[in-house]
Amino acid sequence: MSRFAILVTLALAIATVSVVIAQVPPEKQFRVVNEGEFGEYITEYDASYRFIESSNQSFFTSPFQLLFYNTTPSAYILALRVGLRRDESTMRWIWDANRNNPVGENATLSLGRNGNLVLAEADGRVKWQTNTANKGVTGFQILPNGNIVLHDKNGKFVWQSFDHPTDTLLTGQSLKVNGVNKLVSRTSDSNGSDGPYSMVLDKKGLTMYVNKTGTPLVYGGWPDHDFRGTVTFAVTREFDNLTEPSAYELLLEPAPQPATNPGNNRRLLQVRPIGSGGGTLNLNKINYNGTISYLRLGSDGSLKAYSYFPAATYLKWEESFSFFSTYFVRQCGLPSFCGDYGYCDRGMCNACPTPKGLLGWSDKCAPPKTTQFCSGVKGKTVNYYKIVGVEHFTGPYVNDGQGPTSVNDCKAKCDRDCKCLGYFYKEKDKKCLLAPLLGTLIKDANTSSVAYIKY
């Protein structure tokens, strides 16, 4: 036999052995069907849910469990839930596999010998998968920290849910500039598909955006804070002595590299970092074991952390951090705080701005509706009504707009822009900000801050 033939035979033998090694053993394979009775306990979003059960595999690692749930009939999401059945408090959904591609009745979740975890409709159409076929997967596991993993024979992760966050970060989970770098909100409690709010990590910082018009607008976050490419939601113990922790700290930690620029914490409408040791942001300090916590970008654009308080007898989930908090009187900075439209002062929606002035606010308050929001048609003029002492939610993050410029030039830009619903003008600094979205208008004690709203 020639040397070439020997080499080819040897390569084929090695490949054959590799394929055998890469297979999931029969006792670790599973195929489960979305069918049967719904669970009886209260869950977030008022969702109906079904347990996933297999003789070969456990889908529960306390307090985390993988299930199917729906908020609309016959549209199921494969999701991870946190909470215990004996608790009276609502159990929470903290990871979705197929939020934009729900499945129907009798859908299947399967892990075959090739190591690919597949969610498919009853007719076989694949709706979601891990794309891990023939990559050495030998098993499936839900870890005690809520990370769902597919691992190889050495325990190394081939795929993990921590690399694919949706709207939530669990303790120890990260966003990465060179990976999945954002959280995206749900559309609503009843609609789990991608919503208009996002929190994005880039080389400049961690920034919150709202996009309802095709133009992303910044409304929160830490846009000038250097996280060095990775930000991790963490909970650490603070010790008063060598043995007993006195408190637990909720943190946003940057990548573990030396020296960081503390960033520009200019008058942002948010909670400011409590200290900045090595670039770490201290969100809050709690006096109980907050190891089971999560950070959630809500469907309303809010950013909140919740911590599980095991000693409580009722309502064991506690809101342990809020970016738009009542404590810092920053609720008015949330674009959706007053619904579609409203005038907000000190955490209260006090008025509904109209061409007739500031009227009483209700959840029916809305900006003027018209199809002619620009002066592109010959002879067409655009009308505005004026609100004195008001600020747009994005103003603090864009240095109040562009300028210096005159109020007439600012108006002319909004006149010509069909997407512009109004403009905000800083008379003292001669700054101009065009607004394609209005939402919650924030009272400004400075009467030289004026809004002009189209109608």
UniProtKB/Swiss-Prot annotation:
One protein family per Pfam: B_lectin
What positions does the record give for glycosylation? Answer: 56, 106, 191, 211, 241, 289, 446
> Which residues are the signal sequence here?
1-22
Q: What is its main location?
A: secreted
Residue(s) carrying S-nitrosocysteine: 374
- In this chain the PAN domain maps to 374-455
Domain Bulb-type lectin: start-end pairs: 44-163
Cellular compartments annotated = Secreted; Secreted, Cell wall
Gene Ontology annotations for the cellular component aspect, listed alphabetically = apoplast; Golgi apparatus; mitochondrion; plant-type cell wall; plasma membrane; plasmodesma; secretory vesicle
What PROSITE patterns does UniProt report for this protein, alphabetically? Answer: BULB_LECTIN
Disulphide linkage map? 410-432, 414-420
Q: Which GO terms describe its molecular function?
A: carbohydrate binding
- Identify the keywords attached in UniProt to this record, alphabetized: Cell wall, Disulfide bond, Glycoprotein, Lectin, S-nitrosylation, Secreted, Signal
The entry's protein name is EP1-like glycoprotein 2
